[in-house]
Structures are given as C-alpha cells and as structure tokens.
C-alpha cells in the first residue's frame, strides 16, 4: 500500500491573498463545500485575528465541515493570535491551530529582530501554548527554504518536543531548486528525533515556476502533506496548484510511493468555481484545468488522438471532470428537476430560499431556450453576492448612438430600502452607467480593470463582467455581475465592487 499524502488546501487563506481575489464569508462557504466534496484532508479557513470576517469564516467553515475534514486557523507565534484562533475553532469537530514564525537570517534580523536562541524558544512556546487548546497543532518555519539547515533542525526539534503533530517546511519565496529542497526534507527526517511520529508538510511558492516540482520533491523525501491552492492562487506568482500535485501523484503513484484521497473528477468544477468567485481567470494553457488542457490543433496531433487518445493525452479528461453528460433545463422544467441539478452541482437551499432561486431560474429560462450548468452556477453565485448587498441595482436604461450623448438612467435601492432614480451622461454607455451609480453611493472607486466573457452558450448567452476598482487607500476590490445585457452586467459588477469596499471598511470597524 502506498503512503497517504494529506492535501491541505489553503485557497481560503493564502490563495485569497492574491491581489483582488478576496472573498466574503458566504463565498468562502461555497468554496469550502466544494473542497469537502473533493475530499481534501485539511481546509485552512483563515487567519482569525486578522479581521472579524476571517474569524467568522473559520467559525462557519468549522461548523460546515463536521467530521469530513480538519479545519485549520492560522496564527503568528503570539499568544493573543492563538487565543483568537482557538475561539474561532470551537465550532470545528476536527480543529487545528497552525502557528509559527520566520527562521531565515533575513526574517530573524530584519523582520522579527530576534536571535536564533529566541527563535527556538518562541517555537517551543507557541506550540506548547496552542496545545492547551487543541491536540492537533501544526508548526510552520517561515522561509525555511532560505534558512541555515542546522538551525532549521534545532527549530523543528523544539516544535516536535513541544508536541507539534505537523511541521510545515515552507519555501516561502519560491527560491529553492527542487533537489536542494528535497535534501532539506530528508535531512529533517534523518536528524530530528521523534519526527517519525509527526507529519512533515511542504508549502511551496511558484516565484520561479517550480512550486509543483518542489512539492513533489518533498514527497519523494518523506513529506506526507502538501499545502496547495485551487488554480495555484496565492501571493506574487502563487502557490502549488492542488490540481497539479494531485494528478501528478495519481499518474506516478508507484514511483512516488504515494496516493491522495482527492476525488479528481471534481477538479475542473473546483477550478471554475474559484475562478468565477475570485474573478481570477485561469490561463488557457494551465495544466489540468485550462481551456486548452485537452485541446489539439496540430493536424498530426489530431490524427493521433482520433486513432488513440493516449498518443497525445496522458490523462482522460473525465478523470478531472472535464467531460461528461449534463441535464439541459428549460422553462418547462419543474422544481424537482432544478433542485436535483443544483444538488449535483453542490448547491442546497432551504424551501423558502429555493422559491426565490426557482423564480430567478424561470426569468432566465424565459430569455433562453435552454439553461445550462453554467447558467445555473452564474445564477446561484450572483444571488450569493447579493446576500449582504448595501446597494442593489433594480433597473437600468441606457440610450446611446451617433450623434446621441450616452445617457444612463438607473434605479438603485439602498440598505434601508429607499429607491433612488438617477440620470447621468458619459463618454460611453458603461461610463454613463457608472456615473449614475456614483450619484447614489457614498464612496467612489477608480476603475482599474474591466473584463467581459460569455459564461454560457449561444447568441443569448449570459455575459459576466469582472471589474477591479481602486479605493482611496490603494486597495483593490473585485466586483462581478452577470446578465444577458452586457451593460447591465457592467453596472451590476460596479455596484458589487462598491458593496465589497463598504463591507470591508465596516468589517475593520467591527460593525
């Protein structure tokens, strides 16, 4: 029997640190539900002390997960951080506190301003302190990839002696070469007393494009947990992509003496879900889940694949959920058919909620002959984005053309239910719509990025607009909107981004 490799997903914590990829609690719960469906072993749900939103996310995901997986909260090696994480994790049946500090010379000297001896003592203390609350404590040695190996051994020994159940060896800056990183893991396995009773974890970044290779090299040398994100989301160039390491282990299980429990046909759905929620598009040539991952344009390749798929494909698309049958719904479809299909897509609703969903489905079905999975997912996610809406776009009319001045008339409701009807002109229909919104909302953001794509099929496809706006403090907020009318989609996206900006400000104020 091959070794079980634990998959630790940090999409909701490290992945969310990608600029513009922030998610609210409701969106995190949708992603967490998909991670549970996929069978990941650990969900790192957030950094509880960082904000009330992260605290609530850890609480709610802990409640959602039940016995299905471990739920983890991140902390610094600071007592108050650990106290806060422990409080958030009270809802989890399988809680884990993830605590630690930097261990490289630059971190000790320039960031923490401590000596090596003080670092070792802090490592020992933070693990011991966390063990007062939970049995499962993971220690991270930040920037281990650039640390002195003998010193790293001392730090990890202190964490193991203090009772750590997992020790995380991050290549925080993506600096290491795979073989050298693997040697670090083997050195720890050979020199830390008692480490055979502890899981070694690897957390690698993609700054030099080697995150997956680094993680697999860690597995070859004794690591039994990989920390990763859907689509490789993460700071700077991102983290190890979950879909890549999982499929690499599946394809080379015997060579690596390893397997995972991830349900691989859920990978593509997870990728699309995270992409849509965060507004971070997946590059077409992305391994495993990109639009071109199973596409063949060369005549020679096409001929080969038609004769036998394995001539140019090492993975069956169905193994990652890239192919399969679907139920196509229409205005004639009843409650049962819609509820069944939404359940298969991972969405469940209470009866009173489902009535609203069904009514929205009928609105779409009246505009389209056939409603596909992409329509349903867009519909549900748009509804989730509106859960805590401060401003809601109720109606929009736009007139433009040569020689007309583009004019937008918008009806917008605020959180008190007051309806505002405003009119504005602009350089184009979208600009006019945005200026109309600005007449009502209490804040303003500068448009930094605008993108549009068809997320369903046909000439009557639903178009989704993603915008990123920059607030006065320089922070970027993402908004998304979907509609058959692209101008309406644009206005919805802008309002969504404004709502996020206001919600974030209120969260920081504890409101």
Tell me what each language-model feature is:
Residues 4-5, 9-11, 247-249, 254-423, ...:
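A mid-to-C-terminal "edge-of-domain" accessory segment
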Residues 408-412, 455-478:
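Positively charged, aromatic-enriched nucleic acid-contacting surfaces
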Residues 68, 170-172, 227-235, 247-260, ...:
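Short beta-alpha connecting loops at secondary-structure transitions
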Residues 176, 183-307:
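Catalytic alpha/beta core domains of metabolic enzymes, predominantly
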Residues 407, 416-441, 445-456:
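Small-residue-enriched alpha-helical segments and adjacent helix-cap loops
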Residues 5-7, 17-42, 56-66, 79-200, ...:
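Alpha/beta enzyme core
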Residues 476-478, 482-510:
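Mixed-charge, glycine-accented linear interaction segment located at domain edges/termini
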Residues 14, 18-19, 47-52, 104-106, ...:
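Short, small-residue-enriched loops and turns at beta-alpha junctions
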């Amino acid at each position: 029997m091959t070794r079980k490799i634990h998959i630790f997903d940090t999409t909701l914590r490290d992945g969310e640190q990608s600029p513009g990829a922030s998610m609210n609690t409701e969106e995190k719960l949708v992603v967490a539900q998909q991670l549970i469906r996929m069978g990941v072993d650990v969900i790192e749900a957030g950094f509880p002390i960082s904000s009330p939103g992260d605290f609530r996310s850890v609480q709610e995901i802990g409640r959602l997960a039940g016995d299905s997986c471990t739920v983890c909260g991140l902390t610094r090696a600071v007592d108050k951080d650990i106290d806060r994480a422990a409080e958030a994790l009270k809802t989890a049946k399988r809680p884990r506190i993830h605590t630690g500090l930097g261990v490289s010379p630059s971190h000790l000297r320039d960031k923490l301003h401590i000596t090596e001896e003080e670092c070792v003592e802090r490592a020992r203390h933070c693990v011991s302190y966390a063990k007062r609350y939970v049995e499962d404590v993971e220690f991270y040695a930040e920037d281990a990839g650039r640390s002195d190996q003998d010193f790293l051994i001392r730090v990890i020994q202190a964490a193991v002696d203090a009772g750590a159940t997992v020790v995380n060896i991050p290549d925080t800056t993506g600096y290491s070469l795979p073989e050298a990183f693997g040697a670090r893991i083997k050195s720890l396995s050979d020199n830390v007393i008692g480490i055979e009773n502890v899981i070694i974890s690897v957390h690698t970044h993609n700054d030099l494009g080697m995150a997956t290779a680094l993680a697999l090299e860690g597995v070859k040398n004794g690591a039994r947990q990989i920390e990763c994100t859907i689509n490789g989301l993460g700071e700077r160039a991102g983290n190890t992509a979950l879909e890549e390491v999982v499929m690499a282990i599946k394809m080379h299980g015997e060579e690596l003496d390893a397997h995972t429990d991830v349900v691989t046909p859920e990978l593509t759905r997870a990728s699309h879900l995270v992409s849509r929620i965060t507004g971070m598009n997946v590059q077409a040539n992305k391994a495993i889940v990109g639009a071109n991952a199973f596409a063949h344009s060369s005549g020679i390749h096409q001929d080969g694949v038609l004769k036998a798929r394995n001539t140019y494909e090492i993975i069956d698309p169905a193994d990652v959920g890239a192919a399969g049958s679907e139920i196509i719904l229409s205005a004639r479809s009843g409650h049962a058919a819609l509820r069944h299909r939404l359940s298969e897509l991972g969405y469940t609703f209470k009866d009173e909620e489902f009535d609203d969903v069904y009514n929205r489905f009928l609105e779409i079905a009246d505009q389209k002959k056939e409603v596909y999975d992409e329509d349903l997912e867009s519909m549900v996610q748009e509804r989730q984005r509106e859960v805590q809406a401060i401003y809601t776009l109720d109606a929009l009319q736009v007139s433009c053309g040569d020689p007309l001045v583009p004019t937008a008339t918008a009806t917008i409701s605020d959180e008190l239910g007051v309806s505002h009807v405003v009119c504005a002109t602009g350089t184009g229909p979208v600009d006019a719509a945005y200026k109309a919104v600005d007449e009502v909302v209490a804040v303003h953001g500068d448009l930094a990025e605008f993108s549009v794509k068809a997320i369903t099929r046909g000439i009557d496809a639903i178009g989704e607009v993603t915008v990123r706006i920059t607030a006065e403090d320089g922070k970027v907020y993402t908004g998304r909107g979907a509609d058959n009318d692209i101008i309406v989609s644009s206005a919805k996206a802008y309002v969504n981004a404004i709502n996020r900006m206001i919600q974030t400000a209120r969260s920081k104020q504890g409101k």
